[in-house]
């Protein structure tokens, strides 16, 4: 038995880069309360239960069968993030847990149900949502208790670019932002796709559309990647995946009467080809940081932009100044978005895209919501990265997004705030660049290939 335990521990170890924590230790840390309860809590018969007030909630509308698995993965991801774990680990383990529940506890293989625009089946999906929620800890317990011969080799997953991602509710009553930060395709389906995918979705009129986008972009991305034409550029693939995502979201919005929508800023990174593509709708910005500055790669889709204003009016819309800012038909201060079905065609669902080479002087990509860009310009962002690198060790690189979000709230941002960062060079290079050292030492770093 001792030998089996040693082998099992070895399987869970991780030695790649500076990600020195084992996956086993991360799981045990995240679920410490459940493990403690399992080890010594014993239910005593006839023990009176404390009074718990019951809040009435309207029963949820049943979603379609083809969305159950993606919805479950995002729900688990959100729960893992609340337990304080790094975003890349949360992505990987949310897929692992959802797959374990789907295979071991569910009578229906929801992972295998494909999207079909002509079929909208909702049978048993409410029960399925409850199943995926209730079986998170049992699934983790099974994963931890598997013997060495059958447990997944988790160390294979620690690959791809380094990422950081976080969000804060700020002064808003509800959190309508969502995000994702996949270091590569291995975090989605255990495949070998090397492309990294990052995104921020800023919801409005409810969280439904932003949550749907974060839960299902990985599905449409993989579908496009698997069926891509050799002539399709990275930019084409990202655009197609967003268009397919919006198609699916539109069906769900109509069926469930969603009235809101979401901005989107997405980035696909191919480190092998030294290329990155961005696709966006709305005013959530995307930046790249070089050795000397941040520069914005996206253009905000708002009524104040002359081209966007002209398109809205040509589509039959009107622009009104409400509360000191232009709004489409007096309602929305955006001209493009995912969802917002009642506002079409004035509110366009067509993403804008670009593809740029990754230069040797580029260090990281940063995606954010307007809660960040409303209070920080490009120079501010550079100084925040510099301040973090000088105050914290490089091992804390995953906390950079939380640091920027916190500083945005302190600077007076009244919105939800979200930041996702993809490192185009190892975090150690960013720290060397930003450390307050001599000019000679700094110039040596910036000249590195």
Swiss-Prot record:
Residues 54-56 are annotated as: Interaction with fem-3. One of its GO terms (biological process) is cell differentiation. Pfam families: PP2C (PF00481). It comes from the Eukaryota. Binds 2 magnesium or manganese ions per subunit. GO terms for cellular component: Cul2-RING ubiquitin ligase complex; protein serine/threonine phosphatase complex; protein-containing complex. InterPro entries: PP2C, PP2C_BS, PPM-type-like_dom_sf, PPM-type_phosphatase-like_dom. Gene3D superfamilies: 1.10.1740.220, PPM-type phosphatase domain. This is Protein phosphatase fem-2. It comes from Caenorhabditis elegans. The gene is fem-2.
């Amino acid at each position: 038995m001792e030998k089996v335990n040693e082998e099992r521990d070895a399987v869970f170890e991780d030695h790649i880069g500076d990600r020195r924590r084992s996956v086993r230790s991360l799981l045990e840390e995240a679920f410490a309360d459940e493990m403690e309860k399992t080890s010594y809590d014993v239910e005593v018969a006839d023990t009176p239960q404390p009074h718990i007030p019951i809040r009435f909630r309207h029963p949820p509308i049943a979603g379609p069968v083809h969305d159950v698995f993606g919805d479950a993965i995002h729900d688990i991801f959100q729960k893992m993030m609340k337990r304080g774990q790094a975003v890349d680990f949360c992505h990987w383990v949310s897929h692992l847990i959802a797959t374990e529940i789907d295979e071991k506890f569910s009578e229906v293989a929801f992972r295998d149900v494909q999207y079909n625009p002509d079929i909208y089946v909702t049978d048993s999906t409410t029960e399925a949502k409850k199943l995926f929620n209730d079986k998170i800890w049992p699934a983790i317990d099974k994963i931890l208790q598997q013997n060495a011969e059958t447990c997944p080799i988790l160390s294979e997953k620690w690959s791809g670019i380094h990422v950081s991602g976080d969000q804060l509710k700020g002064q808003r009553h509800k959190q309508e932002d969502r995000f994702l930060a996949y270091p590569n395709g291995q975090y989605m389906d255990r495949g070998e796709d090397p492309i990294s995918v990052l995104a921020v979705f800023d919801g409005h009129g409810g969280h439904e559309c932003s949550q749907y986008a974060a839960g299902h972009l990985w599905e449409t991305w993989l579908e496009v990647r698997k069926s891509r034409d050799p002539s399709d550029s990275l930019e084409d693939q990202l655009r197609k995946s967003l268009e397919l995502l919006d198609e699916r979201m539109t069906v769900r919005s109509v069926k469930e009467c969603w009235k809101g929508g979401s901005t989107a800023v997405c980035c696909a990174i191919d480190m092998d080809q030294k290329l990155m593509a961005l696709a966006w709708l709305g005013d959530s910005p995307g930046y790249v940081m070089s050795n000397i500055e941040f520069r914005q790669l996206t253009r905000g889709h708002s009524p104040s932009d002359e081209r966007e204003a002209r398109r809205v009016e040509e589509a039959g819309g009107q622009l009104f100044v409400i509360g000191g800012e232009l709004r489409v038909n007096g309602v929305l201060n955006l001209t493009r978005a995912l969802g917002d079905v009642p506002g079409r065609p004035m509110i366009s669902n067509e993403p804008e895209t670009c593809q740029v080479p990754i230069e040797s002087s580029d260090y990281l990509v940063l995606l954010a919501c307007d809660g960040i860009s409303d209070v920080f310009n490009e120079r501010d962002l550079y100084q925040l990265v510099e301040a973090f690198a000088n105050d914290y060790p490089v091992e804390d690189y995953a906390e950079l997004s939380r640091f920027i979000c916190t500083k945005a709230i302190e600077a007076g941002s009244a919105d939800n705030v979200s930041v996702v960062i993809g490192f185009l060079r190892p975090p150690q290079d960013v720290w060397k660049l930003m450390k307050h050292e001599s000019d000679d030492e700094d110039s040596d770093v910036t000249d590195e290939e």
